[in-house]
Design a protein with these regions (language model features):
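Surface-exposed cleft-lining segments at the edges of enzyme active sites
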Residues: 28-34, 74-76, 108-114
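Charged, often low-complexity linker/regulatory segments
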Residues: 1-50
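Nucleic-acid nuclease catalytic cores
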Residues: 131-162
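Non-catalytic C-terminal interaction segments of nucleic acid-processing enzymes
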Residues: 166-183
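Conserved catalytic cores of phosphodiester-cleaving nucleases, focusing on short active-site segments
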Residues: 86-89, 98-110, 127
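Mg2+/Mn2+-dependent nuclease catalytic core
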Residues: 109-131
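Short secondary-structure junctions
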Residues: 49-58, 138
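Active-site metal-binding core of divalent-cation-utilizing nuclease and nuclease-like domains
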Residues: 57-95
């Protein structure tokens, strides 16, 4: 039958996500280092997440909420818009098992523009909407991960459906015997 999102502990979820990101940097460092499109990176990460979360579906750019398009309310803009999350870990057709939602940004360390910062702010606003259970049609994701991918490190902000909680992780490639592959 599988595991529900309420049976997995946060520390186990965080470990699985970090293991997937480590695998991405190890096996696919070439696409990160050579400025390949962000969608290519998210696709590869989704594969590694699927290997970790075998009882779940892992989808990229998935825009359905049951039979309806996925929408969230943007409080700052007072609008309700369709959204296309970068990656989700969920069980299709079961809103009660929406586990993790990812928004991912690839960052060129030498060229952080105002547009990049504006897009990052918008992605974080979307994440808060995904985990906010007070929306008109709540999506009820348990965790929202904002992942910023740099050539030599990554940065994660984790949002919980309990608005008072947030976790931050920064990992440099030299940390924890972190290794890269040139393949």
């Amino acid at each position: 039958m599988g595991v529900s999102c309420y049976e997995l502990e946060f520390k186990d979820i965080k470990k699985k996500v970090l293991d997937s990101i480590n695998e991405l940097y190890f096996k696919d460092y070439y696409i990160i280092h050579n400025d390949v499109n962000e969608r290519s990176i998210t696709h590869k990460l989704a594969i590694y997440l699927q290997n970790q979360f075998t009882d779940y579906d892992v989808d990229c750019e998935y825009n359905r909420n049951m039979k309806n398009p996925k929408k969230i309310t943007f409080i700052e803009r007072n609008t309700r818009n369709r959204v296309f999350p970068d990656i989700i870990v969920h069980k299709r057709g079961e809103i009660s098992n929406n586990l993790i939602i990812f928004e991912i940004k690839k960052c060129k360390d030498d060229n952080v523009t105002n547009k990049y910062l504006e897009n990052k702010k918008h992605d974080i606003e979307k994440l808060k909407g995904y985990v906010n259970n007070n929306d008109e049609v709540p999506l009820k994701y348990k965790y929202g991960f904002f992942l910023e991918i740099h050539k030599d490190f990554f940065f994660i902000e984790i949002y919980f459906n309990d608005k008072s909680k947030k976790d931050v992780i920064e990992k440099r490639l030299k940390d924890d015997n972190f290794k890269m592959s040139g393949n």
